[in-house]
Regions:
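Conserved acetyl-CoA binding element of GNAT-fold acetyltransferases
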Residues: 65-76, 80, 104-106
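Conserved GNAT acetyl-CoA-binding A-motif
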Residues: 95-114
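Short hydrophobic/aromatic beta-strand or adjacent loop that forms the aromatic wall/cage
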Residues: 42, 142-146
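Conserved active-site tyrosine of GNAT-family acetyltransferases
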Residues: 123, 128
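Short glycine/proline-centered loop/turn elements that form peptide/ligand docking sites
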Residues: 114-119, 133-143
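Conserved acetyl-CoA-binding loop-helix of GNAT-fold acetyltransferases
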Residues: 80-97, 118-121
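Conserved beta-strand in the GNAT
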Residues: 46, 52-60, 66-73
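Short amphipathic alpha-helix that is part of the acyltransferase structural core
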Residues: 1-30
Length: 152
């Protein structure tokens, strides 16, 4: 079940639980802690399975008509069960109902790391379209792929 979380402390607790279980994607502690800290101020959705949280997704406004899928994680034992897609669908519905026209997401470009190749394929399967690659957005070893989606 996907639900929107409003409580700031609960948002951080869920984010910490999930992100600390996904160190392949969130191995840099400083970045991980940044997401955990910042998520309290973002639109936050959590996936609950069997009485505990299996994943979450956060949206942040990046423009008058655009939100960014700022961070998302689903615990590995729940991968390939549709939870990520459910989170994205709920985020799309909510963003559209709030009047946003576009959603974007940033990830490491396809072809750099196998784990991120799976992430890229997931975003494409959810309906995101390739927008731009910024080779040095993060650093040269991690070129940034930006995907966008119309919510109209």
């Amino acid at each position: 079940m996907i639900k929107r979380i409003q409580d700031r402390d609960e948002k951080q607790k869920i984010a910490r639980q999930v992100l600390e279980g996904l160190t392949e994607w969130f191995e840099v502690e400083e970045s991980r802690e940044g997401y955990i800290s910042d998520c309290k101020d973002w639109i936050f959705f959590a996936a609950e399975e069997d009485g505990h949280y299996a994943g979450f997704l956060c949206l942040k406004e990046t423009g008058k008509e655009t939100v960014e899928l700022a961070v998302m994680g689903v615990l590995k034992e729940y991968h390939r069960n549709g939870i990520g897609r459910q989170l994205v669908e709920k985020a799309k519905e909510e963003a559209a109902s709030l009047g946003y026209s576009f959603m974007q997401v940033k990830t490491v470009k396809m072809g750099v790391y196998e784990d991120y190749d799976r992430t890229n394929r997931f975003y494409l399967a959810c309906g995101f379209k390739e927008f731009e690659v910024i080779e040095t957005y993060w650093d040269e070893a991690n070129p940034c792929q930006i995907y966008v989606m119309s919510l109209a």
